[in-house]
Amino acid sequence: MQTYKVVVLGASGTGKTSLTVRFVNGDFVETYDPTIEDLYRKVIETNKGEHIMLEIMDTSGTERYLAMRDLYIRNAQAFVLVYSITSRVSLLELENIKNYICQVKDRPISQIPMVVLGNKCDLEDTRVVFPEEVEALTKKWGIEDFLETSAKIDMNIQSAYDCLTLQLMSKQSFLNGSSNGKDKKDKKEKKTHKKDSGSNNSSINSSSSSLSVSGGSNLSISSSCSSSSFSNLSNSTSSTSVNNLNQSQTNAPIRTKSKRSLKSAKVDKNPKGKCLIM
């Protein structure tokens, strides 16, 4: 089963956690508890009848956890940008987030699956942001899908993830490439380093030479072996493992991934409907 990483981003207090919990568990979170990091999983069915796994990272909206947010953006394939219709500041912040995503991913926004959600649309009496202006703004940004949502009354949340899933399927060719320019640069540097290492080994093996070691002994290198064969090593103050010479140049630290707590997961068959853009 194919797994896609989705990151939910937006200002603090816009209802990111409530939207995510409503989508994954079908529940509404009444109390506000600032999030540091929560990972949710849900299996959904695509419009082609295939099942995929969405790993949804609910992030903090505070500046304190920017370093963590960078890591999530770098590893994610899709993004949910959330603002509150009761806060114009939260809408203005989305443009900075959108620009930063493009910078980290090193791609145009047209190649990145992304939806913009205007949350808390059940609070009509305190609305300060209207759908017409946001629709014009997202069109200017190049974002395909914009919806107004409500975690409280469960409005348009399923439709939002339907739209995001369709984008994931249609932009599959971009997702299969390198996640960003930095990855391409790292791969190029590794390839160059490997080539240089190979050239150095070839120059060592191409001719016989005599190396002076402690105690006045000679260390012979034979060109007839693919891996250097050493002989006539005597009167040395300590025995040396020759094989470690090559290994010490190629060994690299192994990175491990920390475990994250996973919330509940369930299988949901999405209705195959057209995305509703408000």
Swiss-Prot record:
A lipid is attached at C275 (S-geranylgeranyl cysteine). It is an enzyme of class 3 (hydrolase). GTP binds at residues 10-17, 58-62, 119-122. It catalyses: GTP + H2O = GDP + phosphate + H(+). PROSITE patterns: RAS (PS51421). Keywords: Cell membrane, GTP-binding, Hydrolase, Lipoprotein, Membrane, Methylation, Nucleotide-binding, Prenylation. One of its GO terms (biological process) is signal transduction. A motif (Effector region) lies at residues 32-40. InterPro entries: P-loop_NTPase (IPR027417), Small_GTP-bd (IPR005225), Small_GTPase (IPR001806), Small_GTPase_Ras-type (IPR020849). It is found in: Cell membrane. It is a lipid-anchor. The modification Cysteine methyl ester is found at C275. GO terms for molecular function: G protein activity; GDP binding; GTP binding; GTPase activity. Residues 198-209, 236-251 have a biased composition (Low complexity). Residues 176-209, 236-278 are annotated as: Disordered. The keyword tRNA processing does not apply. Belongs to the small GTPase superfamily. Ras family. This is Ras-related protein rapC. It comes from Dictyostelium discoideum. The lineage of its organism: Eukaryota, Amoebozoa, Evosea, Eumycetozoa, Dictyostelia. The gene is rapC.
